[in-house]
């Protein structure tokens, strides 16, 4: 009788350990795929607009910046979608209060930066969240 009780206890303990291990594995990100994508993809366009707007909102510069060149865009699929974007941006002639498409600054006010953005995206709900931003001077 006692041996049977021990076997049952060990069996239940083994099931508990397996369930804990399984639930931990489910919580971890599982990479489905990472691929380089084209800037013309609709969710990429929206994401580029979002990162530009977010950069300009949080920047202490008096002028808006705009994307001059896209260097790389990767889409990472896990339990959600992330874009990893590397771009060159330049300071424009528009102050932050202006929302027009403006020329880039020339001369003394010229400033060019290279930025890496990691963005959480749910395109069909138009949800964007900046996960990481790193910008450095490039001129």
From Swiss-Prot:
Similarity comment text for this entry: Belongs to the cystatin family.
Glycosylation sites: 134
GO cellular component: cytoplasm; extracellular region; nucleus; sperm flagellum; sperm head
SUPFAM superfamilies hit by this protein: Cystatin/monellin
Organism in which the protein naturally occurs: Rattus norvegicus (Rat)
Cited Gene3D superfamilies: 3.10.450.10
Keyword vocabulary terms for this entry: Disulfide bond, Glycoprotein, Protease inhibitor, Secreted, Signal, Thiol protease inhibitor
Protein name: Cystatin-11
Gene this protein is translated from: Cst11
Role according to the record: Has antibacterial activity against the Gram-negative bacteria E.coli. May play a role in sperm maturation and fertilization.
GO molecular function, one term: cysteine-type endopeptidase inhibitor activity
SS bond list: 94-102, 115-135
Signal peptide span: 1-28
Name of a matching Pfam family: Cystatin
Main location: secreted
InterPro entries cross-referenced by the UniProt entry: CST11 (IPR042930), Cystatin_dom (IPR000010), Cystatin_sf (IPR046350)
Subcellular locations according to the entry: Secreted
GO biological process terms on file: androgen receptor signaling pathway; defense response to Gram-negative bacterium; killing of cells of another organism
